[in-house]
């Protein structure tokens, strides 16, 4: 097998969700990536190219295959076999959108292999059906920052192309599974709490749309929907929040269900904050990230395109 036999590659950014009170609605792309290199093959095979994805299922029990197969079946198409090399620096089960990136990549994979000619709206809805909510998937698909709502028959998003901030991620080395993070949430909220949560979330979105990140950071601290309950699973949260506030950051929030903690800070100050937080949290990976404006990208092998002419 050589590079000339490669059909195409798929690159998908990771993501964060919620930013505090934007629960299951606000998503933002992050500069960690999943890349699939797709080759002709007689049977389905997945091989890991980085330590991050070492141990992934190598056959049809792989999540990427399963989502691609469901996508092809939905359009009554046969999914031809391929060898997929998987490269990723998105850590698994850390709240950085690894599963959403895999789902988006799988839908792109089915679209390319089966010639489905899916629109971005189609891809978004299919990914949201898989995820149950649009935040991570929409950010990985479209890039930038998104606010969305998923319903069974339709998925709606509004995209903010430019998030003019730096992001520093504090990534603990332990995992928090989404189902465990869901289990600690209350089954219901008192009405007055729901009203306050709605107001805080509304103001968060208004601040984001106005590029008022200082106000957005204040609203991130006022979340009452999930972070107060999930804090018990991530003991670093309050410590990172305090340290970041002392360094002049806009705001701090759990990334998705955690355990990664995101700190938003003025553009150009991310690397300095990364160094400072590294001193305080030596037991965590501290990464300076950006918000890519571009989402998933397909690169086709020009030699394969010539063959198909």
UniProtKB/Swiss-Prot annotation:
Pathway(s) annotated for this protein in UniProt: Amino-acid biosynthesis; L-threonine biosynthesis; L-threonine from L-aspartate: step 4/5
Main localisation: cytoplasm
GO molecular function terms attached to this record: ATP binding; homoserine kinase activity
Native source organism of the sequence: Bacillus velezensis (strain DSM 23117 / BGSC 10A6 / LMG 26770 / FZB42) (Bacillus amyloliquefaciens subsp. plantarum)
One Pfam family here: GHMP_kinases_C
UniProt keyword list: Amino-acid biosynthesis, ATP-binding, Cytoplasm, Kinase, Nucleotide-binding, Threonine biosynthesis, Transferase
GO cellular component, one term: cytoplasm
Annotated protein name in UniProt: Homoserine kinase
Main function: Catalyzes the ATP-dependent phosphorylation of L-homoserine to L-homoserine phosphate.
